Amino acid sequence: MELPVRLVVGLGNPGEKYASTRHNVGFDWLDRLASSQRVAFTLETRFRGLCARIMLADTDIWLLKPQTYMNASGMSVAAVCRYYKIVPEQMLVVHDELDLQPGVIKLKSGGGTGGHNGLKSIVADLSSQVFWRLRIGVGHPGDRNQVVDYVLHPPRREEAALIDEAIDHSMQVWPLIARGDFAAAMQRLHTRQEN
């Protein structure tokens, strides 16, 4: 078993303009988790983000939706980590993933940023790549010149349904992730998608 999770970061952009876009699936995932735990987000100006707290086995787990816009997410994440003395290995970042098809979710530790500006910002501000990522597939437009426009638009109805279903499944795996049983979480999460 790894270290239990103490911080879950959902990546996205603030404001109605970006709500329901592919780039905001990290926010959507975190909203679903907060709703299931019956907690609400409040603005914490010192962290430049919307925060909530849940408890699991007498451990505080902080939920964070940075309000800095994607490219500066690391500033918000680093502030929370410093304040609560959370090391990167105790953090899960939930984000959109172009390299996975809609409906596919993968859990992994460390690795590169895959060109994701939110991840780049977090890596730069924490000086570490060693944190857990829950990668939610949104598909790829097929042309890298169309990526920015693609992620800043909502998924098509059938893609949204697949993403929703995958998020629902990942919520069933959440307790394993939270307590640091990542091997079991990956097995359950990834096996379902191979059938």
UniProtKB/Swiss-Prot annotation:
HAMAP family tied to this protein: Pept_tRNA_hydro_bact
Keywords carried by this UniProt record: Cytoplasm, Hydrolase, RNA-binding, tRNA-binding
Keyword Ion transport: no
Membrane-traversing stretches: none
UniProt similarity note: Belongs to the PTH family.
Site residues (Discriminates between blocked and unblocked aminoacyl-tRNA), renumbered to this chain: 13
CDD domains: PTH (cd00462)
Active site residues per record: 23 (proton acceptor)
Keyword tRNA-binding applies: yes
Catalytic activity: an N-acyl-L-alpha-aminoacyl-tRNA + H2O = an N-acyl-L-amino acid + a tRNA + H(+)
The name this protein goes by in its record: Peptidyl-tRNA hydrolase
Superkingdom of source: Bacteria
Gene3D superfamilies named among the record's database cross-references: Peptidyl-tRNA hydrolase
Compartment(s) where it occurs, according to its Swiss-Prot or TrEMBL record: Cytoplasm
Cited Pfam families: Pept_tRNA_hydro
Protein's gene: pth
EC top class, as a word: hydrolase
Assembly: Monomer.
Residues that coordinate or bind tRNA: 18, 69, 71, 117
UniProt source species: Nitrosomonas europaea (strain ATCC 19718 / CIP 103999 / KCTC 2705 / NBRC 14298)
GO MF: peptidyl-tRNA hydrolase activity; tRNA binding
